[in-house]
A protein has these predicted regions:
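Acidic, His/Gly-enriched loop-helix segments that form or flank divalent-metal centers
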Residues: 1-100, 104-110, 123-126
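Hydrophobic/aromatic beta-strand elements that line small-molecule binding cavities or substrate pockets
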Residues: 113
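Acidic two-metal-ion nuclease catalytic site recognized across multiple nuclease folds
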Residues: 130
Length: 130
């Protein structure tokens, strides 16, 4: 970043300022809440607007908890290889209305992943074999 000229730095900062901390989506009949990290300091009464940047970007979710009965929580940030109760590490984890899509591309055997919210179809890159 420091090596960029001032005009390019400003473009990068403007690009980053346009990012949302979360997205709420309705796809078909299903509700989704997309965040990078988790819902730090979660309480059922807390509105999404009340969460801090740290809560949404850096907090790690509790994969044993169902946060919402009527909304699917979609997160990244925590590689699925590190979820203790995950029977299929390195693949998208789905349990308790939670979809974890960070499949550990930085780890040996990890991969990039995506999920189509309309169909549930999962997409993966090739394994990262180190």
């Amino acid at each position: 970043f420091r090596a960029l000229d001032s005009e390019m730095r400003e473009e990068v900062l403007n690009f980053l300022e346009d990012f949302s901390l979360y997205e709420e989506l309705t796809v078909g009949e299903k509700q989704y809440l997309l965040v990078h990290g988790g819902l730090g300091g979660f309480t059922p009464e807390k509105r999404i607007e009340e969460y801090s940047l740290h809560d949404l970007v850096w907090a790690r979710p509790d994969y044993q908890k169902e946060y919402f009965a009527d909304t699917n929580l979609v997160t990244g940030h925590t590689p699925t290889q590190t979820i203790p109760e995950n029977d299929n590490p390195g693949y998208i984890y789905k349990k308790y209305h939670h979809i974890a899509i960070d499949c550990g591309a930085c780890f040996p055997g990890g991969r990039l992943a995506a999920i189509c919210l309309e169909t549930g179809e999962e997409f993966y890159s090739s394994d990262n074999n180190g």
